[in-house]
Structures are given as C-alpha cells and as structure tokens.
Amino acid sequence: MSAAMRAPGARGLAPSPAALGARRGSARAPFHAARIARRRPSLARRAARAAVESHETDVVVIGAGIGGLCAGALSAKYGKRVTVVESHDVAGGAAHSWKRDGYTFESGPSLYSGMSQWPTTNPCGQVLHALDEPLPCVYYNTWMCHLPEGSFLTEVGNDQFVDVLKRFVPDVDGVNAAQEWLRLKTLMKPLAAASSALPPSAVRTDAFAAVTLARFVPGLLAAAPVLPEIMAPYSKFLEKNEIKHPFIKNWMEVLCFLLSGAPASGTLAAEIGYMFDDWYRPNSTLEFPVGGSEAIVEALARGLRKNGGRLELRSHVESVDVDGASGRATGVTLRNGSKIVAKEAVISNATVWDTLKILPPNAMESVKGGDDWVKEVNETKTCASFMHLHLGIDAAGLPDDLEIHHIYVADWDRGVTAEQNMVLVSIASVLDPSLAPEGKHVIHAYTPGNEPLELWQGLERGTPEYERLKEERSAVLWRAVEKAIPDVRDRVEKSFVGSPLTQQRWQRRHKGTYGGTGWITEDSDTIPITSATTPMDGLFVVGDSNFPGPGVPSVAAHGWSAAHELAPFWKQCQMLDKVAP
C-alpha cells in the first residue's frame, strides 16, 4: 500500500477539483463526473507481438514496476537510450491492474496525494513533473474508520479529527485524547518541515553532490536542531514527548504501518513527519488518479516512450550478463535467447533477492565489497505479504456518499502489525465510475503487509489444501467489507481471492513478500541511506526491497537515485530548477 503524500498549493498543471468533480468533505458531496469513455488498450498493456531482438542500448531496466519505470523514464529524459524489459504482459508491478467484464481490478496502491499538483515534494509526483505528464485526479478528504472504539468518518486537512476524538475516545488516566492530539500536532511541525528539507531528486553519490545539494543547505541548517530526531525511529519521538494516550499512540502506529509497512519502532520519524504534514495541514486533500493506479503507470510509460525509451513486455530476463575480466554488468539475456547490451548500466527493479538469483554464480562475490552486499541481501528481513479480495458488486440502493476508503482494526492490544488484525478496503468506483460497469462498484480489500509468508510455503496453487487456506485467510477481508456494505455477499457478481503465492507467481517476487524491512530499530546506531548503487560496476537496484522499503514515494526515490548515478550533474541541476524550485 502506498501513502503517497503531498497536496500543495494552487500552482500546477493538473485539472482543478471542479473540473473533475466536487471535493468530498464535510459537505459530503458525491462525485458526479460523466463516465469516462472506454479507452483503447493502454501503453502499459500494449506489447510487441514479436520477440524482442538482440540490441544495444545505454541502460536496460529489469522490471516495469513504478521504481523501474521512474528510473527508466528519467534516464531517457536525460538523453540515455533506455530499454525496460518486463516479464509480465502488463506494466506496473505491484501497482498493475487487470480487467474483467467491465471491471478494473487494482492489485496495489490506492491512497495517494502529491501526484497531480506541481510543485510537490512527493518523489513520484516530481517524476511526473519532470516528464511533463499531468495526472488528472479526483480530490477528496474523507475516509471511514472501523476501530474498536466504533465506526466514524475522519477528514484530512482540518481539525475534524478533534471532534471525533471528543466523541468517541474517553480520557485515560487523566489524559484527554483531543488535547494530546493538538499537542502532538504542534510538536510535529518542526519535524514535518525538516522532513521536506532535502528531496531525493537532489541526491547523488559523487563529488558533484556538493553542487546539487547546495541550494538546500539553508533548509538543512534550519532543520539542524531536529535532525537527530527525524533520523531516529518515530517511537523514540513519541516517548521523548510523553505521548501517553493509548488511542493517539495506536493511531500513529496505524499511520506508520500504512506508510512504511512497519510499526513506529521501525519507521523513521522523517517519514511520518512528511506524511503528517501532508495530511493534517489546513485544506490538505487526498487524490485518486482518474483511471486508477494504472493511470500512473501509463503516465510513466508515456514519459519513457516520448523520450525515446522502449518498454518491452513479455520479456523475461534469464540472467544479468557480467564481464568476467572487469566484473562489470554489461547487459541481460532474455529467456528467448536475445541479448540486450547495456553500455552504461543495468538497473534491476526485481527484488534484491531475485536480482541475486539472476547474477552469474559468484559474480558479485568477486568484486570489491560484493561479499558484504550479498550478506546484507541475505540478512535483509522480508515484509509479510497480503491477502487480497477483489469484488465486483451490484451497487443498486447503496448511498451516494459511500466512502472510497475504509480501514478496519479488530484489536488494539494485538498491535497493528499482527496478522489478520488490520484490513484496508478501497471502493475505487465511488470516485471514478469508469472502473466498473454502470450501476456497479469494484472493491479491493487487503491485509496491508501482515500475512505471514511461512503459512503458504510448500503449498501448491489449485490444490484443495491451498483453496481451503485461501477461504480461511480471506474471511477477515469479508468481515471488513461488511463493515462498509453489510449485505455485500448478496451483491457479489465477481469474486477473486489472492494470496502470497499469487503475488509470488504473478509478480515474480521472492516468497511473495511485500518488500524489505528491519533497517530501522530502536537500538540502531546507524541509519541507511536511499541509494540504488551496488558494489558491482554498472549494476543498480531499485524498488521496495531496498531502504526505506515499500511505498510509491520510496520506490520513486530509488528511480531518482539510479538516474542521477548516470546523469551529468549539470543536467540534474537543471531538473531541480523545475521540480524542486
């Protein structure tokens, strides 16, 4: 799941909320947009029917997830010849969608901000800005919570949450939840400002970093007093500032988990500061791309192609080619035997574990620092996975003000990371009717990275044992959807359940994992950096298995990192004039 946050001011190229439908808020105005015309197959889905032939390029990117597309499109924008090869028949990776009988089912992110209005500090929004690819969005500011305290509507961008706290959350040991929340908001202001002081688009690892970072020095100096806090786990911030009310602490645990796939003890305070600022500044909004997550993928694919890049689907990489004498990555070999020679770089958007599998035996260990990198990869913890429930339902008689997002937590005492304890529900057709047939809704419910991988190891898809476990483990998803639509089972016309094995097979992900985790702990004495580099010359890795882990902003930041390892610093400076003025 992605909390892709940022919705700054009025200046930007995106259509206004009025052009796309009324903003959803306290007035509870439903989205009355005309049904979007059915389009021809998207750029993200159209693939060459002929097998990819051997050729030479500057950069080859393995995998067309958002991280890979960002890296490839930016590299093409900087003038590189780029070929992106994707094993699947559709681009997008964890953000891909699929269609059945007029429904568009989404497999991944559903919660966005900072994608459409420019300038923005969202790394993915900055990529779209760099590519001159506007992203039409529907704007809204409400979502529904089904928590142990009760079910209630909450808003971003104002103090409505204070009213919710006063109504639903009692005092505990003399601590008032509403007052504690207002105190926390004040404490978070310097944290939020510091978190936005240095955009990933400014970073590079060579000596010219002094040039690209120079314009951000004043902001970094202003943030200096809180830098130790933003580079520590957020749990330490809560402890230091004596945030004691159980509900406020639990709510921040939810936000941390939505953002990073980890609890507060495993989430950098910088990450939560960035998101907190985005959600709770006055008049903030969330965004839903018209066309769903696929619209982001299409925009990145357009940006790649219009700058001369190639996107080759159904093109499975069998191995990374490495020069035996120099130890440099020189290209890839596809399953059909074709070879793509990369004069400058191979960028892998496969997970680090899967990337290691397609390197020649001992190739990484043979280069300086390679042993340590292999050890680090093998020791990187895997996030848990997902259970997915995809539904197409009859919407007759459902209220016009049905919310797009619902969050369900069963038991605070178990913790938000506990298996089967937290579910997210997205009803995307509430805001974009084109995603379902007339009079229908499409629903995606999922456990956000809390499904244990080990439960599924050794099972074979399609067996009775597998089907029984799918039914058992998807029951909580049905319960969560029933919180939003009590009679949903009577309305179902299409129903599909996905498991970690689904993710492992269709997304070719190591064990079906959601990504990497475990870099941040309360006893850490060092903090990793966001970097696409590896010890092997010419090989870069991007995606959610690298620090800081899952999320659209995180993987887009890797795209910037990889592109700027290859681009001249003066072109990067020109780009910063545009995306981070």
Give the role of each language-model region.
Residues 274-338:
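Helical element adjacent to the flavin cofactor pocket in flavoenzyme catalytic cores
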Residues 248-263, 424, 483-548:
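A glycine-rich dinucleotide-binding beta-alpha-beta segment and adjacent secondary-structure elements
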Residues 54-200, 517-518:
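N-terminal glycine-rich phosphate/pyrophosphate-binding loop and immediately adjacent elements
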